[in-house]
């Protein structure tokens, strides 16, 4: 019975069953060539042409080039449209202004602008040209409140008109 099954599978119905063995198997090897043709990659030696540094850059900002601590007065609080009701909130705002002012001391000479963090992908910027015509009035009709052809955004937690505190 086994003999007849082998004859059935070796028949012309399955011509791919009798494919020729690869050359390295014909030589009596067990399934793999003696030496691999693939090379190992040393991942530490890979260098990519990238604007993004391979290691984090921690610039040292000296205390002389950064501005001194800017005091937050009532006018600054009013412009922020956020009511600072405690001394801790005042300190937090002063700390944020001091932290943000460090950007003034960063030297950006010779640094190309980065349009996208995915610099290996192609970024096609469209031309800046008007394509829809003059639709300013149509857009402004969607606004709840407008002032001199501008949208009026809702204020923060402080009213725009304030009575002076006594």
From Swiss-Prot:
Sorted UniProt keywords: ATP-binding, Ligase, Mitochondrion, Nucleotide-binding, Protein biosynthesis
Record's subcellular location: Mitochondrion
Molecular function in Gene Ontology: ATP binding; glutaminyl-tRNA synthase (glutamine-hydrolyzing) activity
Alphabetized SUPFAM superfamilies for the sequence: Glu-tRNAGln amidotransferase C subunit
InterPro entries, sorted: Asp/Glu-ADT_sf_sub_c, GatC
Endpoints of the signal sequence: none
Gene Ontology CC entries for this record: glutamyl-tRNA(Gln) amidotransferase complex; mitochondrion
Enzyme class (EC, first level): ligase
Quaternary organization: Subunit of the heterotrimeric GatCAB amidotransferase (AdT) complex, composed of A, B and C subunits.
Any further remark recorded for this protein: This protein may be expected to contain an N-terminal transit peptide but none has been predicted.
HAMAP family: GatC (MF_00122)
Catalyzed chemical reaction(s): L-glutamyl-tRNA(Gln) + L-glutamine + ATP + H2O = L-glutaminyl-tRNA(Gln) + L-glutamate + ADP + phosphate + H(+)
GO BP, sorted A to Z: glutaminyl-tRNAGln biosynthesis via transamidation; mitochondrial translation; regulation of translational fidelity
Function: Allows the formation of correctly charged Gln-tRNA(Gln) through the transamidation of misacylated Glu-tRNA(Gln) in the mitochondria. The reaction takes place in the presence of glutamine and ATP through an activated gamma-phospho-Glu-tRNA(Gln).
Keyword ATP-binding attached: yes
UniProt KW Mitochondrion keyword: yes
Family note: Belongs to the GatC family.
EC assignment: 6.3.5.-
The organism of origin for this protein: Culex quinquefasciatus
Record's protein name: Glutamyl-tRNA(Gln) amidotransferase subunit C-2, mitochondrial
